């Protein structure tokens, strides 16, 4: 009887180990699939030189590299595409989608595959041309460093000072952003209460939101627009 009991315990341990191993493999595959998909989407973008406006000092314009996004090609994959976001300091470089609610793209990738990585998505209450006073973008805090997981680096004020630039590429304009603050707020904070039917030429504030270590808290970056480049007219509007 003793030997039978020992065998049963051994078999139980093997079964538990097997189940855990399968789950780990599934998680690893999900991370891999998500990373692979978003890496392949970068075939739809290319780096292009952008000239900064001349400074008042008469110095030569600064050389800058921007992105040219194939919105037409990407929308053949997913018609919910509204923008592309880049934060060079932390490697964020993803398409931005907008669903009919704030639930679907939590667990669906750009190609609408079920995946815990989800997508970077615009709040469904915002206008897709980014003309609300406050615009909110959401992304997961992934353990593999993807999506919005590295937003937490901006809790370091020195890092934020040295890497405070972000970019939102829209079909007709590019928004140059300055990251001004990194905060932890309640998921029920008033910042998530968007005003209805209030539009403007460009947002007064763009919020990037991700999960925090506490289930009822969120980590956010506050961003302000410093430049608006209208692509069709090449008009450059700098914000003071």
Can you annotate each of these PLM segments?
Residues 1-16:
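N-terminal Sec-pathway targeting helices
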Residues 17-240:
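Solvent-exposed, non-transmembrane regions of membrane-associated and secreted proteins
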């Amino acid at each position: 009887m003793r030997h039978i009991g020992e065998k049963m315990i051994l078999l139980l341990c093997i079964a538990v180990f097997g189940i855990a191993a399968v789950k780990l493999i599934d998680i690893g595959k999900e991370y891999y699939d998500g990373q692979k998909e978003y890496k392949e989407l970068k075939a739809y973008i290319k780096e292009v030189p952008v000239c900064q406006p001349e400074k008042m000092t008469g110095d030569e314009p600064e050389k800058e590299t921007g992105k040219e996004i194939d919105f037409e090609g990407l929308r053949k994959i997913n018609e919910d595409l509204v923008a592309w976001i880049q934060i060079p300091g932390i490697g964020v470089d993803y398409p931005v989608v907008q669903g009919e609610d704030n639930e679907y793209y939590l667990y669906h990738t750009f190609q609408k595959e079920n995946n815990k990585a989800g997508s970077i998505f615009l709040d469904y209450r915002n206008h897709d041309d980014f003309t609300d006073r406050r615009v909110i973008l959401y992304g997961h805090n992934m353990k593999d460093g993807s999506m919005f997981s590295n937003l937490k680096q901006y809790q370091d004020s020195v890092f934020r000072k040295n890497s405070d630039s972000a970019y939102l590429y829209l079909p007709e304009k590019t928004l140059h952003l300055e990251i001004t603050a990194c905060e932890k707020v309640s998921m029920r904070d008033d910042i998530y209460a968007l005003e209805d039917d209030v539009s403007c030429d460009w947002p007064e504030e763009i919020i990037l939101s991700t999960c925090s270590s506490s289930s009822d808290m969120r980590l956010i970056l506050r961003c302000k627009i410093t430049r608006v480049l209208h692509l069709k007219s090449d008009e450059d509007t700098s914000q003071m």
